[in-house]
Curated annotation (Swiss-Prot):
NCBIfam families: apaH, PRK00166.1. InterPro entries: Ap4A_hydrolase, ApaH, Calcineurin-like_PHP_ApaH, Metallo-depent_PP-like. Coiled coil: none annotated. Its EC number is 3.6.1.41. One of its GO terms (biological process) is RNA decapping. CDD domains: MPP_ApaH (cd07422). It comes from Buchnera aphidicola subsp. Baizongia pistaciae (strain Bp). This is Bis(5'-nucleosyl)-tetraphosphatase, symmetrical. Keywords: Hydrolase. It is an enzyme of class 3 (hydrolase).
Length: 278
Protein backbone atom coordinates (compact mmCIF):
# COMPACT_ATOMS: atom_id res chain seq x y z
CA UNK A 1 0.00 0.00 0.00
CA UNK A 2 1.28 3.46 -0.96
CA UNK A 3 0.18 6.93 0.09
CA UNK A 4 0.02 9.60 -2.60
CA UNK A 5 -0.60 13.36 -2.42
CA UNK A 6 -1.83 15.40 -5.39
CA UNK A 7 -2.44 19.14 -5.61
CA UNK A 8 -5.23 21.16 -7.22
CA UNK A 9 -6.67 19.19 -10.15
CA UNK A 10 -9.12 21.85 -11.41
CA UNK A 11 -10.85 19.61 -13.91
CA UNK A 12 -7.63 18.25 -15.47
CA UNK A 13 -8.95 14.69 -15.61
CA UNK A 14 -6.68 13.33 -18.34
CA UNK A 15 -3.57 14.51 -16.52
CA UNK A 16 -4.82 12.92 -13.30
CA UNK A 17 -5.37 9.57 -15.00
CA UNK A 18 -1.94 9.65 -16.68
CA UNK A 19 -0.30 10.48 -13.35
CA UNK A 20 -2.01 7.60 -11.57
CA UNK A 21 -1.06 5.24 -14.40
CA UNK A 22 2.61 6.14 -13.95
CA UNK A 23 2.59 4.65 -10.45
CA UNK A 24 0.12 1.83 -11.19
CA UNK A 25 -2.25 3.29 -8.62
CA UNK A 26 -4.36 0.57 -7.01
CA UNK A 27 -7.72 1.96 -5.91
CA UNK A 28 -8.23 -1.05 -3.64
CA UNK A 29 -5.07 -0.66 -1.57
CA UNK A 30 -3.35 2.68 -2.23
CA UNK A 31 -4.55 5.88 -0.57
CA UNK A 32 -4.87 9.19 -2.41
CA UNK A 33 -4.76 12.50 -0.52
CA UNK A 34 -6.06 15.51 -2.47
CA UNK A 35 -5.71 19.19 -1.55
CA UNK A 36 -9.11 20.16 -3.00
CA UNK A 37 -10.17 22.38 -5.89
CA UNK A 38 -11.13 19.34 -7.91
CA UNK A 39 -13.13 21.47 -10.32
CA UNK A 40 -13.33 24.56 -12.53
CA UNK A 41 -10.79 26.03 -14.98
CA UNK A 42 -9.92 22.69 -16.59
CA UNK A 43 -12.18 20.96 -19.15
CA UNK A 44 -13.33 17.83 -17.28
CA UNK A 45 -14.54 18.80 -13.81
CA UNK A 46 -17.46 16.37 -13.90
CA UNK A 47 -15.20 13.43 -14.72
CA UNK A 48 -12.86 14.38 -11.86
CA UNK A 49 -15.74 14.60 -9.37
CA UNK A 50 -17.19 11.28 -10.44
CA UNK A 51 -13.85 9.49 -10.32
CA UNK A 52 -12.73 10.86 -6.96
CA UNK A 53 -16.11 10.23 -5.34
CA UNK A 54 -15.97 6.62 -6.58
CA UNK A 55 -12.78 5.88 -4.63
CA UNK A 56 -14.57 5.63 -1.30
CA UNK A 57 -12.30 5.28 1.71
CA UNK A 58 -9.20 5.19 -0.49
CA UNK A 59 -9.38 8.93 -1.10
CA UNK A 60 -8.78 11.55 1.58
CA UNK A 61 -9.53 15.00 0.22
CA UNK A 62 -10.17 18.41 1.70
CA UNK A 63 -12.44 21.09 0.29
CA UNK A 64 -10.94 23.98 -1.65
CA UNK A 65 -12.46 27.38 -2.34
CA UNK A 66 -13.73 26.29 -5.78
CA UNK A 67 -15.41 23.24 -4.27
CA UNK A 68 -17.17 25.36 -1.65
CA UNK A 69 -18.21 27.82 -4.35
CA UNK A 70 -19.80 25.01 -6.35
CA UNK A 71 -21.85 24.04 -3.30
CA UNK A 72 -22.94 27.68 -2.96
CA UNK A 73 -23.90 27.85 -6.65
CA UNK A 74 -25.94 24.67 -6.26
CA UNK A 75 -27.76 26.29 -3.33
CA UNK A 76 -28.40 29.44 -5.44
CA UNK A 77 -26.45 31.65 -3.03
CA UNK A 78 -26.18 35.24 -4.20
CA UNK A 79 -22.63 36.48 -4.98
CA UNK A 80 -21.18 33.01 -5.48
CA UNK A 81 -18.94 33.05 -8.55
CA UNK A 82 -20.52 31.81 -11.75
CA UNK A 83 -18.79 30.48 -14.85
CA UNK A 84 -19.91 28.53 -17.90
CA UNK A 85 -17.93 25.53 -16.67
CA UNK A 86 -19.68 25.59 -13.32
CA UNK A 87 -23.11 26.10 -14.88
CA UNK A 88 -22.60 23.10 -17.16
CA UNK A 89 -21.50 21.02 -14.20
CA UNK A 90 -24.67 21.93 -12.30
CA UNK A 91 -26.76 20.51 -15.18
CA UNK A 92 -25.36 16.99 -14.85
CA UNK A 93 -27.87 14.25 -14.00
CA UNK A 94 -25.97 13.18 -10.87
CA UNK A 95 -25.23 16.64 -9.47
CA UNK A 96 -27.45 16.08 -6.42
CA UNK A 97 -25.34 13.13 -5.33
CA UNK A 98 -22.04 14.86 -6.15
CA UNK A 99 -22.95 17.95 -4.11
CA UNK A 100 -24.10 15.75 -1.24
CA UNK A 101 -20.76 13.95 -1.38
CA UNK A 102 -18.81 17.24 -1.49
CA UNK A 103 -20.70 18.59 1.52
CA UNK A 104 -19.49 15.58 3.53
CA UNK A 105 -15.81 16.24 2.81
CA UNK A 106 -13.61 17.84 5.50
CA UNK A 107 -11.62 21.06 5.44
CA UNK A 108 -8.75 19.82 7.58
CA UNK A 109 -7.17 16.40 7.96
CA UNK A 110 -4.66 15.14 10.51
CA UNK A 111 -2.98 11.76 10.70
CA UNK A 112 -1.21 11.78 14.06
CA UNK A 113 0.40 8.41 13.44
CA UNK A 114 2.00 9.49 10.15
CA UNK A 115 2.43 13.09 11.38
CA UNK A 116 0.52 14.51 8.41
CA UNK A 117 -1.62 17.64 8.18
CA UNK A 118 -3.51 18.71 5.09
CA UNK A 119 -5.77 21.62 4.20
CA UNK A 120 -6.33 23.38 0.91
CA UNK A 121 -4.61 26.69 1.74
CA UNK A 122 -2.45 25.74 4.71
CA UNK A 123 -2.28 26.15 8.48
CA UNK A 124 -2.92 29.48 10.20
CA UNK A 125 0.35 30.18 12.07
CA UNK A 126 -1.37 31.37 15.26
CA UNK A 127 -3.33 28.14 15.73
CA UNK A 128 -2.35 24.82 17.20
CA UNK A 129 -3.69 21.59 15.70
CA UNK A 130 -6.50 21.31 18.23
CA UNK A 131 -7.76 24.81 17.45
CA UNK A 132 -7.67 24.19 13.70
CA UNK A 133 -9.53 20.92 14.14
CA UNK A 134 -12.16 22.62 16.28
CA UNK A 135 -12.87 25.32 13.69
CA UNK A 136 -12.92 22.78 10.86
CA UNK A 137 -15.39 20.49 12.61
CA UNK A 138 -17.73 23.40 13.29
CA UNK A 139 -17.78 24.43 9.62
CA UNK A 140 -18.06 20.83 8.43
CA UNK A 141 -21.06 20.36 10.71
CA UNK A 142 -22.70 23.43 9.15
CA UNK A 143 -22.09 22.16 5.61
CA UNK A 144 -23.53 18.74 6.47
CA UNK A 145 -26.65 20.28 8.03
CA UNK A 146 -29.83 20.44 5.96
CA UNK A 147 -29.78 24.23 6.51
CA UNK A 148 -26.31 24.54 4.97
CA UNK A 149 -27.63 27.11 2.49
CA UNK A 150 -28.38 29.56 5.32
CA UNK A 151 -24.79 29.28 6.53
CA UNK A 152 -23.41 29.79 3.02
CA UNK A 153 -25.67 32.80 2.49
CA UNK A 154 -24.06 34.41 5.53
CA UNK A 155 -20.57 33.60 4.27
CA UNK A 156 -21.13 35.03 0.81
CA UNK A 157 -23.28 38.04 1.63
CA UNK A 158 -21.96 39.47 4.91
CA UNK A 159 -18.41 40.48 4.06
CA UNK A 160 -17.67 43.37 6.43
CA UNK A 161 -15.54 41.35 8.86
CA UNK A 162 -11.80 41.77 9.38
CA UNK A 163 -9.60 38.71 9.20
CA UNK A 164 -8.22 38.58 12.76
CA UNK A 165 -8.51 34.97 13.77
CA UNK A 166 -6.87 35.36 17.15
CA UNK A 167 -9.64 37.77 18.25
CA UNK A 168 -12.32 35.16 17.59
CA UNK A 169 -13.43 32.35 19.84
CA UNK A 170 -15.66 29.79 18.20
CA UNK A 171 -17.72 29.26 21.35
CA UNK A 172 -18.63 32.92 21.93
CA UNK A 173 -21.27 35.22 20.44
CA UNK A 174 -19.38 35.91 17.21
CA UNK A 175 -19.39 32.26 16.23
CA UNK A 176 -20.57 32.73 12.64
CA UNK A 177 -18.08 35.53 12.03
CA UNK A 178 -15.30 33.35 13.37
CA UNK A 179 -16.34 30.46 11.16
CA UNK A 180 -16.29 32.69 8.12
CA UNK A 181 -12.74 33.76 8.92
CA UNK A 182 -11.75 30.16 9.58
CA UNK A 183 -13.12 29.07 6.21
CA UNK A 184 -10.91 31.72 4.59
CA UNK A 185 -7.93 30.21 6.40
CA UNK A 186 -8.64 26.71 5.19
CA UNK A 187 -9.50 27.61 1.59
CA UNK A 188 -8.10 31.04 0.61
CA UNK A 189 -5.15 32.02 2.85
CA UNK A 190 -1.78 32.99 1.40
CA UNK A 191 -0.34 36.00 3.22
CA UNK A 192 -0.65 37.38 6.73
CA UNK A 193 -0.09 40.96 7.86
CA UNK A 194 2.19 41.56 10.88
CA UNK A 195 -0.88 41.94 13.14
CA UNK A 196 -2.21 38.50 12.20
CA UNK A 197 -4.84 39.57 9.68
CA UNK A 198 -5.13 37.70 6.41
CA UNK A 199 -4.40 39.50 3.17
CA UNK A 200 -6.95 38.17 0.70
CA UNK A 201 -5.74 39.96 -2.43
CA UNK A 202 -2.07 39.22 -3.13
CA UNK A 203 -1.36 36.03 -5.11
CA UNK A 204 2.27 36.65 -6.08
CA UNK A 205 5.17 34.50 -4.96
CA UNK A 206 7.06 35.68 -1.83
CA UNK A 207 10.14 36.00 -4.04
CA UNK A 208 8.60 39.24 -5.35
CA UNK A 209 9.66 40.91 -2.07
CA UNK A 210 6.20 42.13 -1.13
CA UNK A 211 6.58 44.56 1.77
CA UNK A 212 4.54 44.12 4.98
CA UNK A 213 3.21 40.70 3.95
CA UNK A 214 4.40 37.33 5.21
CA UNK A 215 3.39 33.99 3.69
CA UNK A 216 1.74 31.92 6.40
CA UNK A 217 4.50 29.28 6.26
CA UNK A 218 7.23 31.83 7.09
CA UNK A 219 5.63 32.56 10.47
CA UNK A 220 6.96 30.08 13.02
CA UNK A 221 4.44 27.67 14.48
CA UNK A 222 6.15 25.37 16.97
CA UNK A 223 3.25 22.91 17.04
CA UNK A 224 4.05 21.94 13.43
CA UNK A 225 7.69 21.00 14.00
CA UNK A 226 6.95 17.27 14.13
CA UNK A 227 4.38 17.31 11.32
CA UNK A 228 4.47 17.51 7.55
CA UNK A 229 1.91 19.99 6.18
CA UNK A 230 0.54 19.45 2.67
CA UNK A 231 -1.36 22.23 0.92
CA UNK A 232 -2.35 23.52 -2.52
CA UNK A 233 -4.06 26.74 -3.64
CA UNK A 234 -0.92 28.76 -4.47
CA UNK A 235 0.16 27.93 -8.01
CA UNK A 236 2.53 30.89 -8.28
CA UNK A 237 4.82 29.63 -5.50
CA UNK A 238 8.32 28.89 -6.68
CA UNK A 239 9.95 25.53 -6.09
CA UNK A 240 11.67 24.89 -2.74
CA UNK A 241 10.53 28.20 -1.21
CA UNK A 242 8.69 26.59 1.71
CA UNK A 243 10.30 25.05 4.83
CA UNK A 244 11.17 21.36 4.43
CA UNK A 245 8.13 20.13 6.36
CA UNK A 246 5.69 22.36 4.42
CA UNK A 247 4.92 20.82 1.02
CA UNK A 248 3.21 22.83 -1.70
CA UNK A 249 1.34 20.68 -4.22
CA UNK A 250 -0.37 23.15 -6.57
CA UNK A 251 1.87 23.39 -9.62
CA UNK A 252 -0.58 25.11 -11.96
CA UNK A 253 -1.78 22.29 -14.18
CA UNK A 254 -4.91 24.26 -15.13
CA UNK A 255 -2.67 27.17 -16.21
CA UNK A 256 -0.53 25.04 -18.50
CA UNK A 257 1.93 23.91 -15.82
CA UNK A 258 2.13 20.39 -14.39
CA UNK A 259 0.13 18.14 -12.09
CA UNK A 260 2.37 16.97 -9.25
CA UNK A 261 2.18 13.92 -7.02
CA UNK A 262 4.24 13.03 -3.93
CA UNK A 263 4.62 9.49 -2.60
CA UNK A 264 5.02 9.51 1.15
CA UNK A 265 6.85 6.23 1.66
CA UNK A 266 9.94 7.06 -0.40
CA UNK A 267 9.47 10.86 -0.70
CA UNK A 268 9.44 10.56 -4.49
CA UNK A 269 7.81 13.08 -6.85
CA UNK A 270 5.90 12.31 -10.05
CA UNK A 271 4.67 14.89 -12.55
CA UNK A 272 2.42 15.06 -15.58
CA UNK A 273 2.56 17.86 -18.12
CA UNK A 274 -0.65 19.81 -18.65
CA UNK A 275 -2.61 19.36 -21.86
CA UNK A 276 -3.66 23.00 -21.60
CA UNK A 277 -1.58 25.41 -23.64
CA UNK A 278 -0.15 28.39 -21.78
Amino acid sequence: MSTYFIGDIHGCFNELMHLLEKVSFDANSDVLWLTGDLINRGPKSLEVLRFVSSLGDNVKMVLGNHDVNLIALYASIKNSKKSSLMNNLLKSHDIDYLIYWLRKQPLFRVDHKKKIIMSHAGMYPYWDIQTASCYAKKIESMLCNHNYDTFLDFLYNNSDIKSKLYECTVFKNRELECLKLALNVFTRMRYCLPNGELDMTCKQSPSKNISSLLPWFFIKNSCLEDYCVFFGHWASLEKNITPKNIISLDTGCCWGGILSMFRLEDKKWFVQESEIKK
